């Protein structure tokens, strides 16, 4: 592939690479352009890495902006409003029949309308998140007033819409999905800080070499697991009406090549994103109840309850709750990505059947069974890497396994985007080779 990249007959690919790198670099630089009234002292007090580790929204912002909130700038809100808007539109298409019809039956026109809806919703979410961030800064900005509030919000909204524009340019004229590449690039840009943070943490721990070996081993194992789960597929053999009419043995042999490939990682990283939002909601609800009532203080007044509700009890309870949410959202999002009813209907329209399975309800039941199996494997993989690493971290007293927020989420995003980008580059090279 390197030889092909150096070939002068690949100007379009080179232009795509240059455009992608240029826009990603501009976005990264833009995250360091100061927002009015937000100084370094403000960031240290509110948005530093140490404080953000206990704030789920800050963790999400860290993941999707690559730690940009440690140097909060004009473009630091980044692609997060667009991610939120895309999730909501995906959910609404499964709930609202008109949107579902627009997506499935109206072709390119329907897809363009959904893209427009996503843009409008992105603008709305940019307003909501910018106002929320501005309001959270009121306690650490000395000269707080409505003008400061307005300028900070306006700056973040403008930056978010610029990032959305760049993302669409990359998707249309660059190397791949713009939002995914932006997230990936920001995560990679923050790796030096993460490595530095890890080395500092190791200095304060006993058996440094064993910890380093353990960290590297865990990183390699999880990376291999991410690659495997991302590339693994289940092949379901298909037969069309045209193939059934073929009589010769050679044709029957060739007809077995038609398959429906179902990825094991159907839901991708979205179950973890949904889970993070759910944790954010319940954490906020807990804080509101705690401030407004003294119900939790009443519980801890009793010695028996105080001894039972220990640190480890709460930790285990949280892990069970976390794992349950991941399992639920993996099943939920898998049905959004691949609806067995829709697949069975498309098979019926195209006169295609699954080998050995009757069309109609039998096909739908069979696909639902396969989808449940896939979702179960995917959920176990995510739970093992998220909860398992947290348990190992607590038992071994290691503070570096999940570096700064959603470490495994970032790792899974990196693997998915890098594999997809390599495939797209190969596809562009093959297209240009055939063209010339």
Curated annotation (Swiss-Prot):
Keyword Cytoplasm: no
Intracellular or extracellular location(s): Plastid, Chloroplast thylakoid membrane
Keyword vocabulary terms for this entry: Chloroplast, Membrane, Plastid, Protein transport, Thylakoid, Translocation, Transmembrane, Transmembrane helix, Transport
Matches recorded under PROSITE patterns: SECY_1 (PS00755), SECY_2 (PS00756)
Residues annotated as transmembrane: 17-37, 72-92, 122-142, 146-166, 209-229, 269-289, 309-329, 380-400
GO process terms (BP): intracellular protein transmembrane transport; protein targeting
GO cellular component: chloroplast thylakoid membrane
The family this protein is said to belong to: Belongs to the SecY/SEC61-alpha family.
Classification via NCBIfam families: 3a0501s007 (TIGR00967)
Gene: secY
Organism encoding this protein: Vaucheria litorea
Protein name per UniProt: Protein translocase subunit SecY
Gene3D superfamilies, per database record: SecY subunit domain
Assembly description: Component of the plastid Sec protein translocase complex, which is composed of at least SecY and SecE.
Highest rank taxon of the organism: Eukaryota
Function in brief: The central subunit of the protein translocation channel SecYE. Consists of two halves. These two domains form a lateral gate at the front which open onto the bilayer between TMs 2 and 7, and are clamped together by SecE at the back. The channel is closed by both a pore ring composed of hydrophobic SecY resides and a short helix (helix 2A) on the extracellular side of the membrane which forms a plug.
